[in-house]
Amino acid sequence: MATSGSRNFELDLAEYVEEAFERCGMELRTGYDVRTAKRSMNLLFADWANRGLNQWTIEQTSITLAEGIRDYPCGTLTMTVGASTSFTVGETITGGSSSATAQITSKPSSTTFAITIPSGTFTSGETLTGSGSAATTTLSVAVDFSDVRSTVDILSAVVTRSSTDFEIQRVSRSSYLDIPNKSQSGRPNEFFVDRQITPILRIWPTPENNTDVVKFDRLTRIEDVDSATDTVDIPFRFYPCLTAGLAYYISMKRNPQMMPMLKSVYEEEMQRAMDEDRDRASLRISPSYDYYRD
């Protein structure tokens, strides 16, 4: 008999839910069953983010630095405006009706700004005024924070100058606080991740030009499941783990007697998946030729 030749087995949300209910000793019957299971699955993904590194959710992000600005969003944060050409990188823009403020870190196009985390909330349609250039424009759409807020953590970072990458070291909150002169300028060599709801990348020394680029590998949230026909943002290695975890979460609400067994299966599947989802690198061992002579 011939094998199938296919390697594309994939479940959608409804099929995961059906399997999870069966593991709980029940049948999927109502629309509410799907809704409560969808909620449980999204909560399960939050648990995975707390458990450690999910390799498939790592993204590399690049941000062009601006002279004199040391705080940046941990992701892509832009404003779509009527025109950006008359504004200056590094200046502060202020909303005419909201009084919200942010600094321009770069101008990716003639109708966009890359900005720092705003103070206040800009309003779509309001007039923006530059502090130095006195230029004005209109904000076309509300600022979207979803990309920045999807960042769970930053794993590593470099600063690129003249096509050369220079590693920058991560420091703790207390170490960053202890820096006596945070305004000192130079090529950045340290960073601190301020893990707010909208996380901030704080770098030091403060950038000395508008051409250096910080590149960082960030761990991001797993994509939500929103409808029964959605496929799930995980590699196939995690299919058993997701099914076991969803069954365990559903059992808390529908069949508590099954919880101990389902939790045990989930933890076993989770450990197996996490052991596999890791970096691999070559290990080289060199013998030492030192010796003692009597």
Task: Give the residues covered by each predicted segment.
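Glycine-enriched, solvent-exposed interface loops adjoining structured elements
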Residues: 1-76, 138-294
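Autoprocessing Asn-cyclization modules and mimics
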Residues: 52-142
